């Protein structure tokens, strides 16, 4: 029994020793074995407590092991993150080093171009030379076709371009020869200095620097000459700059072309234009680009080529030679540049000098949608003005036909006498064929004498002194206005400083009709003018005075007092009455108009003299070629007025075939200046006569005092 208990104690001790983690368990097992060996009975309670204690210690040991494993994993992750960060830093450092190397290389290149190395050991000295100057670009046939498609050049322009290209190539050859000579001289001087070795290095470097400066100055002069040449080409319309070609002004258009190729190109274009020359010869005065293109259907390319063709509605016909001469005489004159401001419609950009204006013109007004739209609007304005000019010419021709054709029957309602003429009759033309129109404008050469051969121009019966008849330019040539006319070009008038081709009365009526209540105050009318037209945003004192004048002058504008104050409305019936009217009355009031020499000579002379006094270019002394017109200006009026009195005194001496005049009153011819708003229109000679009460409806056009209504 003792042996069995000892074996059990040994087995228990082994299990306890394997499961325990401290030396206390061995001591306890030893004491248990000793007690059992002494013959004591085993205590079951002590064994269960020991087992529970051992299990707790095992669990604690497992938790400690798990914590150690977690700490090791976290340390490994941190090490990996640190390694990744180090790798990223290394990559960033490498990139920075590469960027620094690139910057250093660029700086070396720039410094090499600006200041070449001055090394005595070099066999030859490197001098910076412009690549565009020394190596001309060769234009391929495809580029030639593109140039021909983009720009249709006339034979004259091609000839000028050919001459300028030849001169440019000669300059390039001279520059190359000069460069070679300079390089040889520098090499010889360097060799001499190396062999001699007497001069110090500082003096050698100074000499080389002075030679380089001289050479660079000559290169700059050549580049300036080329730029001036390109600017002249741009002014003449031979060279256009596309938006995507910023480097084009530094090189000529046909640089590098062989003269033979240019001659062949010129021959081809001239052969293509020969057919158009025959058709365009009859319409050369209406050609916008002074080329051989017919005026009936001008192409868009011709309008784009020559920017001087139409500027703000004014046509200018110039040949390339005259244009180049004008640019040489006035290098800073341009139709789109004046007083330091860009005159492009709607631009008004301030440019300090002419090169800045050219830079602004090439950058801001390039060939794009906005510029083409503005060009189309300008073309519409020009077309409207041309139509109006054609109508006025037809009226003038009809008036001249009526005045110079001999009439046998009295006219019931002739046109009002508006003496605006640009054609005069000579003595031979008026006597030989009185019924034919004059073909060439001539000046009267016969001395001015009192009228003795025929009666007066206008004879009246029972005319009473009632008041003067006034025919205003705005009433005679009143341009009708509609909302469609303004809406069509609304954006153009808002942005471009262009005078609208309408009278002030029509504009005031349009402003009132556009209002919701069909009535506006004076300030609201002003605001409408400035809002709709950019032209009225300046010189407010002038046009506001004209608006007030028109409001008080015309009876179609009615002033109404209401809660707001004084408002203006439109009477459509009165407005339609003030449209152009013809003199209606008794046919016996107006006699026949004779076209004899005695009538034509003083009448035309008075007309020319009055036009010369008012500084109209067609009738100035220089253009007429007659220096006596200016000196006889004042005498002609008195002579014309005296002629009427002279014919009145010689009534009894008239021929039997002519009826004597009845109650002749002198007709005084005086000049009536237009209103301030009509200063741009032509001046008219207005006849002031005594008339009957039948003409009372024309008194609406009298000038009334202007009411200064400041509301």
UniProtKB/Swiss-Prot annotation:
GO terms for molecular function: chromatin binding; core promoter sequence-specific DNA binding; DNA binding; DNA-binding transcription factor activity; DNA-binding transcription factor activity, RNA polymerase II-specific; DNA-binding transcription repressor activity, RNA polymerase II-specific; identical protein binding; nuclear androgen receptor binding. The modification Phosphothreonine is found at residue 687. Residues 438-452 have a biased composition (Low complexity). The keyword Ubl conjugation applies. GO terms for cellular component: nucleus. InterPro entries: FH_FOXP1_P2, Fork_head_dom, FOXP, FOXP-CC, TF_fork_head_CS_2, WH-like_DNA-bd_sf, WH_DNA-bd_sf. The keyword Methyltransferase does not apply. Coiled coil: none annotated. Residues 382-403 are annotated as: Leucine-zipper. There is a cross-link at residues 321, 406, 411, 476 (Glycyl lysine isopeptide (Lys-Gly) (interchain with G-Cter in SUMO2)). A zinc finger (C2H2-type) spans 340-365. Keywords: DNA-binding, Isopeptide bond, Metal-binding, Nucleus, Phosphoprotein, Repressor, Transcription, Transcription regulation, Ubl conjugation, Zinc, Zinc-finger. It holds the Pfam family Forkhead. Residues 320-332 have a biased composition (Basic and acidic residues). Residues 499-589 bind DNA. GO terms for biological process: cardiac muscle cell differentiation; cellular response to tumor necrosis factor; DNA damage response; endothelial cell activation; forebrain development; heart development; immunoglobulin V(D)J recombination; innate vocalization behavior. The modification Phosphoserine is found at residues 115, 692. It is found in: Nucleus. Its main location: nucleus. Residues 416-420 are annotated as: CTBP1-binding. Residues 701-711 have a biased composition (Acidic residues). Residues 1-41, 273-292, 305-332, 424-456, 645-711 are annotated as: Disordered. The leucine-zipper is required for dimerization and transcriptional repression. Forms homodimers and heterodimers with FOXP2 and FOXP4. Dimerization is required for DNA-binding. Self-associates. Interacts with CTBP1. Interacts with NCOR2 and AR. Interacts with FOXP2. Interacts with TBR1. Interacts with AURKA; this interaction facilitates the phosphorylation of FOXP1, which suppresses the expression of FBXL7. Interacts with ZMYM2. Transcriptional repressor. Can act with CTBP1 to synergistically repress transcription but CTPBP1 is not essential. Plays an important role in the specification and differentiation of lung epithelium. Acts cooperatively with FOXP4 to regulate lung secretory epithelial cell fate and regeneration by restricting the goblet cell lineage program; the function may involve regulation of AGR2. Essential transcriptional regulator of B-cell development. Involved in regulation of cardiac muscle cell proliferation. Involved in the columnar organization of spinal motor neurons. This is Forkhead box protein P1. The gene is Foxp1.
